[in-house]
Amino acid sequence: MLSRALLCLALAWAARVGADALEEEDNVLVLKKSNFEEALAAHKYLLVEFYAPWCGHCKALAPEYAKAAAKLKAEGSEIRLAKVDATEESDLAQQYGVRGYPTIKFFKNGDTASPKEYTAGREADDIVNWLKKRTGPAATTLSDTAAAESLVDSSEVTVIGFFKDVESDSAKQFLLAAEAIDDIPFGITSNSGVFSKYQLDKDGVVLFKKFDEGRNNFEGEITKEKLLDFIKHNQLPLVIEFTEQTAPKIFGGEIKTHILLFLPKSVSDYDGKLSSFKRAAEGFKGKILFIFIDSDHTDNQRILEFFGLKKEECPAVRLITLEEEMTKYKPESDELTAEKITEFCHRFLEGKIKPHLMSQEVPEDWDKQPVKVLVGANFEEVAFDEKKNVFVEFYAPWCGHCKQLAPIWDKLGETYKDHENIIIAKMDSTANEVEAVKVHSFPTLKFFPASADRTVIDYNGERTLDGFKKFLESGGQDGAGDDEDLDLEEALEPDMEEDDDQKAVKDEL
């Protein structure tokens, strides 16, 4: 009898030790294959980050992830945050389809079959708000002023619906809007004290924010669509700084026209320049997103390169559209006054500004080597020569794939250097742009056959000398296809995903 009791005690102790064996770092559970199932069983809601120790984006996320974990733990939430070193736990990474770093997945009730992909931003508030939306009601019921104050204080942006009848059609439309937005906390109230505190005497919706004017009152008929539009127009600051944390809000938002102020924080009239930019932004809410970029920051140098800017040329303003075709625009004036920036934006919206195409100077020896060097200024003349078949690599100097291709491309140039009508060429697409070709990836390989109809053929075959030769000898047929590689928007954005073959590129930046 005693031995059985001791056995039960030992098993109970072992179970307790097993649960306690879940190691924590900064309130984040450290998971391995050996304790992953145990963690899922112990926690109803579990957000898991699969990371790599060398990943720059993972390092940038770490303090915000820990802050979110601490906040939820302090609230006594059932939600816990965890992390897995995917380079050590490759079986787990493969099991959950990890192809980039960081990959973040949300597990509910231990369900391993279909965890949700995390889709919000990289700040602690974004993480907490997304998780609360996934685990609770779309809008929190605010029964008194203390609850309302707590909600407003909890996040940079909050939305509260004030409805004397929370079963009304307007209230139902409000809840539909709340369900559609993951990263902003919503509250709903019928309490007269809350109405009074926030100076409302009838039904309405208010967006509270800890920047700019502090609050925005919705006006008009309350419908889901109109509320979503109202929130889109008001949830971001008039001017948002481009950082690792704000990038998802910038690229993931619905506003696809961005004007960027490249401004070193060390410049003497920094406050004045930023103030002018902010004044200009007031007239374009919901139409153009105004973004400030610290041009002195090392992490932003690739963005300067993308716009053909050097640090010494800043402060400067550029505009870009992020629709299907990314197009850049440059102000006609270098003056950075609110009036000049406002005029530039109006002219752009009226369709009176032509795209800005970058070009380097034509090198004196551009055609002296087997691989010809093209720039914006000589591209048309060479690529669309009716008597020549021209095969062009569009590359980025920092791109790892391009560096791997370089010796093969040089050999291809040697192979055809004396050919009467085949030209092998290359163009640095970070410094040169042409209207006839939109480069979406690096490297992009395009073939311009000898003809008068300006035909362009994408190459997507093997990146080998034999593959290229077969393509050329077949007249651009063997290996033709859509181009696909490192997307330009991904190249600009500090993306949440970073796969192994991009690591070399990112480590250089």
Swiss-Prot record:
GO molecular function (one): enzyme binding
Membrane topology: Peripheral membrane protein
Keywords: Acetylation, Cell membrane, Chaperone, Disulfide bond, Endoplasmic reticulum, Isomerase, Membrane, Phosphoprotein, Redox-active center, Repeat, Signal
Tissue specificity: In the mammary gland, expressed at higher levels in lactating mice than in virgin mice.
A single cellular component GO annotation: cytoskeleton
Disulfide bonds: 55-58, 399-402
Positions bearing the site annotation: Lowers pKa of C-terminal Cys of second active site: 463
Modified residues (Phosphoserine): 333, 359, 429
Chain's role: This multifunctional protein catalyzes the formation, breakage and rearrangement of disulfide bonds. At the cell surface, seems to act as a reductase that cleaves disulfide bonds of proteins attached to the cell. May therefore cause structural modifications of exofacial proteins. Inside the cell, seems to form/rearrange disulfide bonds of nascent proteins. At high concentrations and following phosphorylation by FAM20C, functions as a chaperone that inhibits aggregation of misfolded proteins. At low concentrations, facilitates aggregation (anti-chaperone activity).
Protein name per its UniProtKB record: Protein disulfide-isomerase
Lineage, uppermost ranks: Eukaryota, Metazoa, Chordata, Craniata, Vertebrata
